[in-house]
C-alpha cells in the first residue's frame, strides 16, 4: 500500500492543524460556563456532552496528517482520563498551548530537542510545586465540594460523598441508569457476588423469594458436589449446632441437590446452595477472598483437601447471608481483620502491576468487596439524551473525588497553575531549554484564559489581576467575583491537574520533535459500472 510522506515544518504544521481542530472543539466546554458539544451517533439520538474525552474520541478527520495530530491530543485526553478520571479538557488546552508556542519557536530556528528538554524541566518543577501546596481532603463536606465542582451539581456531590462515606475509599461505586426520573443511591453492605440459589425451594421468604440465613456456617469449595455422601459427615456436624449452612461450590447436582432440598422442605435443617462466582483462575481467587472474609478454608485439590475429610474448622461464618435468584450477599464475615488486611494489600499490589484494563476492573471489584462494600448511583432523567449526559458528569465527578482523596486538592479554576508560575520562572536554564521553560509558562495561563473566555470575560485582564493576587485567591467565573478558591469550594484535585500537565507536555514534546510523518495514501475508488450494462455479461447471475 502506497504511503504519503511529509517532512520538517510541512509535517509539523499538518499535525498542528489537527491539534487545533480537536482542541478548539473540546475547549469550549471548559469551566462553569462551558458550552456543550453535540455528537452525532450512528444509532439513536445525538449525544449532548461537555466531557472532553468523549468528544475527543469521536473526532476523525479526513486528512490523514491532520488526523494524526488530532489522535495524539485525543491520546492525551484518554491518558489523563485513565490516570485521574477527569481533567481531559484542561489537558487538551495545555497541549494546544505548548504545541502552538513551541511551533513558533521551532519555525524561527530553535532546536526542538533543546525546547523539549526545557518543557520537561519546567513541567517537573510545576508538578512538584503543585504537590507542595496540596491540601488533604477528608470528611463528608470536603468530598461533597470536590464532587459538586466536577459535576456542576450540589445534589450529585451529596450522593457521591454519602456513597464514599458508606463504602469507604476502596469501595466500589457504580453508576447505572435508573428506570425512573429521580437519581438515587443504593448501598449493598458486605460482599456480594452474582450467583443465586440453585433451587427456589431453598427460600425462607416466599413473598420476596429470598433466603435469609442468620449466623450461618459457610462451606467453600471449587469441587462439584454430586454425591451427598461426600458432605454427609459435615452436614451431621452442622445439624448438631442448629445453625443454617451456605454451600458455595462449583455445582451441586446429581442426588445431592434433591437430598438437600428435601431436608430443607422437611425442616431438618436450613441449607442454601449456590454456584461459585467467576471462572477459571478468577474463580479460585474469589473463593479465597470469601474464605478470608469468613474465616474459612477453600476445600480444593490444589491444597490436597477432600470434601469427605472436611471438618467444622474449615467452615467460614458470617453474621448474615442473603440469597436471591441472582445474587448472594455475605454480611459481617468472621475472618480476622489481619487476614483481611493482608489480602487487601495483596490485591492492591496486583492492581499496581497489571496492564489489562479488564483485570484492573475485576481486581478493583474484589478489593471493594473485601474492604468496603458496593454503592450504586442510579441516574434518572426525563430524556435519554439528558440521562447519557448526566451519567458522564457523575462518572467524571466520582473519578475527580477519588483523585482528590488520594493526592489532595489545590485552588481550582486554573488558579493553582498561575500560582506555581513563580517557581517555574525561577528555574535556571539557558538557550533553547530556557525557551522551552517560557513556553510552559505561557501554557500555564491558558486554562484560566479559556475559562474566562467561555464565561464572557477577557482572559488577559483576569490573568494579569490573578498574578497580582494572593496565592489561592482566584476568579469565580460562575459569579464574576474574586474569592478564596478553596474556602469557596472551587477546587481541583492535584492528581487531575498534574496528570493534565504531564501528559500535555509529553505529547506536545513529541509533536515538536517530529521530523517526518508517514500516512497511508487513500486508495482510488473502484470505477463504477457503466450504466445499462447487464451484470450477466460479466459472469454475474
UniProtKB/Swiss-Prot annotation:
It comes from the Bacteria. One of its GO terms (biological process) is protein refolding. One of its GO terms (molecular function) is ATP-dependent protein folding chaperone. ATP binds at residues 29-32, 86-90, 413, 476-478, 492. It catalyses: ATP + H2O + a folded polypeptide = ADP + phosphate + an unfolded polypeptide. It is found in: Cytoplasm. Its main location: cytoplasm. Its EC number is 5.6.1.7. Keywords: ATP-binding, Chaperone, Cytoplasm, Isomerase, Nucleotide-binding, Stress response. HAMAP family: CH60. This is Chaperonin GroEL. It comes from Streptococcus equi subsp. zooepidemicus (strain MGCS10565). The gene is groEL.
Amino acid at each position: 500500500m502506497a504511503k504519503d510522506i511529509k517532512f520538517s515544518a510541512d509535517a509539523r504544521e499538518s499535525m498542528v492543524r489537527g491539534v487545533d481542530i480537536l482542541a478548539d472543539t473540546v475547549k469550549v466546554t471548559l469551566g462553569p460556563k462551558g458550552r456543550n458539544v453535540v455528537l452525532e451517533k450512528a444509532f439513536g439520538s445525538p449525544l449532548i456532552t461537555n466531557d472532553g474525552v468523549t468528544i475527543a474520541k469521536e473526532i476523525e478527520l479526513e486528512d490523514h496528517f491532520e488526523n494524526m495530530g488530532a489522535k495524539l491530543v485525543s491520546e492525551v485526553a484518554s491518558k489523563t482520563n485513565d490516570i485521574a478520571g477527569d481533567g481531559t479538557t484542561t489537558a487538551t488546552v495545555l497541549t494546544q498551548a505548548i504545541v502552538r508556542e513551541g511551533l513558533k519557536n521551532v519555525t524561527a530556528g530553535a532546536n526542538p530537542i533543546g525546547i523539549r528538554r526545557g518543557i520537561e524541566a519546567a513541567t517537573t518543577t510545576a508538578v512538584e510545586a503543585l504537590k507542595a501546596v496540596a491540601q488533604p481532603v477528608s470528611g463528608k463536606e470536603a468530598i461533597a465540594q470536590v464532587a459538586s465542582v466536577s459535576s456542576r451539581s450540589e445534589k450529585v456531590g451529596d450522593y457521591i460523598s454519602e456513597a464514599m462515606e458508606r463504602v469507604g475509599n476502596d469501595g466500589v461505586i457504580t453508576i447505572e441508569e435508573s428506570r425512573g426520573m429521580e437519581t438515587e443511591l443504593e448501598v449493598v453492605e458486605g460482599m456480594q457476588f452474582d450467583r443465586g440459589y440453585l433451587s427456589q425451594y431453598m427460600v425462607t421468604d416466599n413473598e420476596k423469594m429470598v433466603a435469609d440465613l442468620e449466623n450461618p456456617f459457610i462451606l467453600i469449595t471449587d469441587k462439584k458436589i454430586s454425591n451427598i455422601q461426600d458432605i454427609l459427615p459435615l452436614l451431621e456436624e452442622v445439624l448438631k449446632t442448629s445453625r443454617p449452612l451456605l454451600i458455595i461450590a462449583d455445582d451441586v447436582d446429581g442426588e445431592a441437590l434433591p437430598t438437600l432440598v428435601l431436608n430443607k422442605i422437611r425442616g431438618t435443617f436450613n441449607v442454601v446452595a449456590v454456584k461459585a462466582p467467576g471462572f477459571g483462575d478468577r474463580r479460585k481467587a474469589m473463593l479465597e477472598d470469601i474464605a478470608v472474609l469468613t474465616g474459612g478454608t477453600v476445600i480444593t485439590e490444589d491444597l490436597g483437601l477432600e470434601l469427605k475429610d472436611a471438618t467444622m474448622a474449615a467452615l467460614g461464618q458470617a453474621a448474615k447471608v442473603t440469597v436471591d435468584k441472582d445474587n448472594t450477599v455475605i454480611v459481617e464475615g468472621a475472618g480476622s481483620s489481619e487476614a483481611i488486611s493482608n489480602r487487601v494489600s495483596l490485591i492492591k499490589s496486583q492492581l499496581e502491576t497489571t496492564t489489562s484494563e479488564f483485570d484492573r476492573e475485576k481486581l478493583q471489584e474484589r478489593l471493594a468487596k473485601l474492604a468496603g462494600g458496593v454503592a450504586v448511583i442510579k441516574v434518572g432523567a426525563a430524556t435519554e439524551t439528558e440521562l447519557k449526559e448526566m451519567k458522564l458528569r457523575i462518572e467524571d465527578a466520582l473519578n475527580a473525588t477519588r483523585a482528590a482523596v488520594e493526592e489532595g486538592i489545590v485552588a481550582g479554576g486554573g488558579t493553582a497553575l498561575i500560582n506555581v508560575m513563580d517557581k517555574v520562572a525561577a528555574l535556571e536554564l539557558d538557550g533553547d531549554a530556557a525557551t522551552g521553560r517560557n513556553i510552559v509558562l505561557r501554557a500555564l495561563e491558558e486554562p484560566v484564559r479559556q475559562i474566562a473566555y467561555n464565561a464572557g470575560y477577557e482572559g488577559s485582564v483576569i490573568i494579569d489581576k490573578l498574578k497580582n493576587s494572593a496565592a489561592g485567591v482566584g476568579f469565580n467565573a460562575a459569579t464574576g467575583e474574586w474569592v478564596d478558591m478553596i474556602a469557596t469550594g472551587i477546587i481541583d484535585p492535584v492528581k487531575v491537574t498534574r496528570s493534565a500537565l504531564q501528559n500535555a507536555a509529553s505529547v506536545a514534546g513529541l509533536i515538536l520533535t517530529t521530523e517526518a510523518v508517514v500516512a497511508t495514501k487513500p486508495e482510488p475508488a473502484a470505477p463504477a459500472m457503466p450504466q445499462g450494462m447487464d451484470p450477466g455479461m460479466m459472469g454475474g447471475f
